[in-house]
Every structure is written in structure tokens, then in C-alpha cells.
Amino acid sequence: MMGKPEDLKLIDENGRRIDGRKKYELRPIKMEVGVLKNADGSAYVEWGKNKILAAVYGPREIHPKHLQRPDRAILRVRYNMAPFSVEERKKPGPDRRSVEISKVIRGALEPALILEMFPRTAIDIFIEVLQADAGTRVAGITAASLALADAGIPMRDLVAACAAGKIEGEIVLDLNKEEDNYGEADVPVAIMPLKNDITLLQMDGYLTRDEFIEAVRLAIKGAKAVYQKQREALKEKYLKIAEEVGGGE
């Protein structure tokens, strides 16, 4: 959160935001499953101006062997921002923020996976941010969850994520870049909707207790809308496969 220029209005007198959205409106979201031929599972998500690719490999044998768990698979997540993903070119390779977000995403996804079915193996998730525009962690979780489902990894539920935040004293859904830079708070949330479980809850900034509750409720509502889009994307992929199989008869 940065100091806002005096002439920048994030929300107008009609409740419209800088990009024309209403307070409780998501940015446009597009999802596609099975986009990489050489991965066990993959997904591509465009969320506002974010462009994110997720690939899953595994379950596969772990090297070195001392990392193996005798009772379950281990989940490894690598979140990376491409050098060209932001306006000021980023140094290649993982930085402290990428390492931290990798851990956050792993923690959000792990409760959904039935890892005990694959002892002594690893499931690797690679999340590549091709273009960044605020909310990359929730978009990354959403893409990774789709890629896991595409890989056929047994899951208790999909994990869907969304953030709410505070701009100019108002609680709003799904912050864009300007709102994230100059707003007062950001609350990313990830859920397993069928189980009604929260797998990620963070806050950056300052909110009153009532504002925090409102932001969490709004983020959950947004995540449920994202979940429906995930289901549609998976359905679309398998309808395509069915058509291809049917067409080959």
C-alpha cells in the first residue's frame, strides 16, 4: 500500500471504481484447462490483466530419497514472476516474495489433496506469472487447483480464491493494480466450497473488526463465483474430449 496521489480518485460519487466496476464486481476472468501437452495437468487463467499459467507433474518419485514421506506424497510449489510480467523488469529467478507466496499457495492447496494415496512421491506445481496486475496469489491458487484436477490428482474439493479490500473507506471486491497500490487493505481468501472450509486467510493493511468481517464475507462470495468458473472450465475440457472420442468412431 502506497501513498495515493491527491488527484487520483479510486471510487467516484456513483460508487464506480477506476476501471468502471461496481464495488462488488469481479474483474473479467477467463480459464482454460489442459493447455500444456507435456505436463500431467495444466491450466491458464486470465484475471483482469493477470495472465497465469500453472503446470502439475506427478505423483512422481522423489530425489533425493531422504525427502520421501512413508505415509504420504509431498506437495512442492514454485511460484515465479516472469521478468517481463511487471512494468519494471524483474530480475530472473526466485526472490523472497516468490518463495513466501509459494509457501502460502502450498498451504492453501494441501488441505484439498488426498496425499496419503501416494506415499514416497512428490507432486510438483509450477505457477508462472506472465503478466501481473494485483491478486496474483489468488489467481495462482485458482489456476493451480484447476491444473491439479486436470492431472487427475484425487481432491476433496477444488480450491477457489479471491480477495476483497478497502479503498477510500469502502470495502470492495477483487482489487486491481491501482487499488492494490493505493488502497487501505487487502484480504485474500481461499476456500473449499463443498466442505465450507477456508484454506487461506491473510490481511495486508488496517481494518476495523466489522470491516474485516465484511471483507472476508465478500471475498468468500467472490471465491464461490470463481469456483463456478473453475467447474465450467473443467466441464468444457471434458466435453471437448468426449467430442473428439465420439468423432473418431
From Swiss-Prot:
NCBIfam families: ECX1
Root EC class: hydrolase
InterPro entries the UniProt entry points to: ExoRNase_PH_dom1 (IPR001247), ExoRNase_PH_dom2 (IPR015847), ExoRNase_PH_dom2_sf (IPR036345), PNPase/RNase_PH_dom_sf (IPR027408), Ribosomal_Su5_D2-typ_SF (IPR020568), RNase_PH (IPR050080), Rrp41 (IPR011807)
Name of the protein in its database record: Exosome complex component Rrp41
Gene: rrp41
GO cellular component: cytoplasmic exosome (RNase complex)
Keywords associated with the record: Cytoplasm, Exonuclease, Exosome, Hydrolase, Nuclease
Entry's localization field: Cytoplasm
